[in-house]
Amino acid sequence: MTRHFLRDDDLTPEEQAEVLALAAALKKDPFSRRPLEGPRGVAVIFEKNSTRTRFSFEMGIAQLGGHAVVVDGRSTQLGREETLEDTGAVLSRYVDAIVWRTFAQERLTAMASGASVPIVNALSDEFHPCQVLADLQTLIERKGSLKGLRLAYFGDGANNMAHSLMLGGVTAGVDVTIAAPRGFEPHPMFIAAAETRAHQTGATVAVIDDPLRAADGADVLVTDTWTSMGQENDGLDRVRPFRPFQVNADLLGRADSEAVVLHCLPAHRGHEITDEVIDGPRSAVWDEAENRLHAQKALLVWLLERS
């Protein structure tokens, strides 16, 4: 049976732990696994602009012995002159996996229904699951264990990072609090999914509008841009509600004395996070960015071995 990774809860807690353990091993010995030797091909499709995702996937596929066939979604006929199901079926005859950065989650689901090779969500409007695998790998490196950690996210609770942190975090046994202004809460459907998974792992998930309370005693502070792709023209009216949710020295001072700060990047310095924090001793942002490479390699190896 072909396995896909379209959202964070596509992996069980045990499977997620396997991927993270493999990511750690591949970080120590980058060329120890070569499942794409040949080279075999992986389609890497970008309908949204990308820096970290493109570099990390292209290099990761090369280190696994494969060849990345990178295409701009605008130069293909994805979903225009044939169904996404048909495209998935056709691409499966050419490549061994498909990595896709797209818009609506439904597009991934549609292609996966026709594909016979693994599909990886490299970012959608609803989820950013590869990033959260890298976040979890970083926290294991910094904290040693994930279970029982208190993670607080500050900013737009309706964006893909908030959704993925909820689902991926509680899968790992992390207690997740989303601190967001009123009107910017996570989608109720994804809150419910996170609560279901949290019940299985013993973790907790909460959504509040008080950033100070969320920061109190937290082990991990996470933020993301206040303006996601496609919202750049919304102006000051969009930014204003988020200002109390900035991750700055005062907010960090309320967290645990050994708290770690994460940001998936790109960072809008002076908006969601200050220079003092992102460049400070408790920032793990650069390790987090590097771990995209290792976590995604581990994910591809894991999926290919099971499909």
UniProtKB/Swiss-Prot annotation:
Q: List residues traversing the bilayer.
A: none
Catalysed reaction equations from the record: carbamoyl phosphate + L-ornithine = L-citrulline + phosphate + H(+)
- Which is an annotated GO molecular function term of this record? ornithine carbamoyltransferase activity
Gene3D superfamilies assigned:
Aspartate/ornithine carbamoyltransferase
Sorted alphabetically, the keyword list is: Amino-acid biosynthesis, Arginine biosynthesis, Cytoplasm, Transferase
Family of this protein: Belongs to the aspartate/ornithine carbamoyltransferase superfamily. OTCase family.
Q: Name one GO cellular component term.
A: cytoplasm
Show the InterPro entries listed in the entry. Asp/Orn_carbamoyltranf_P-bd, Asp/Orn_carbamoylTrfase, Asp/Orn_carbamoylTrfase_sf, Asp_carbamoyltransf_Asp/Orn-bd, Orn/put_carbamltrans, OTCase_ArgI
Q: What is the lineage of its organism?
A: Bacteria, Bacillati, Actinomycetota, Actinomycetes, Mycobacteriales
Q: What is this protein called?
A: Ornithine carbamoyltransferase
Q: Where in the cell is it found?
A: Cytoplasm
Q: To which species is this protein native? A: Mycolicibacterium gilvum (strain PYR-GCK) (Mycobacterium gilvum (strain PYR-GCK))
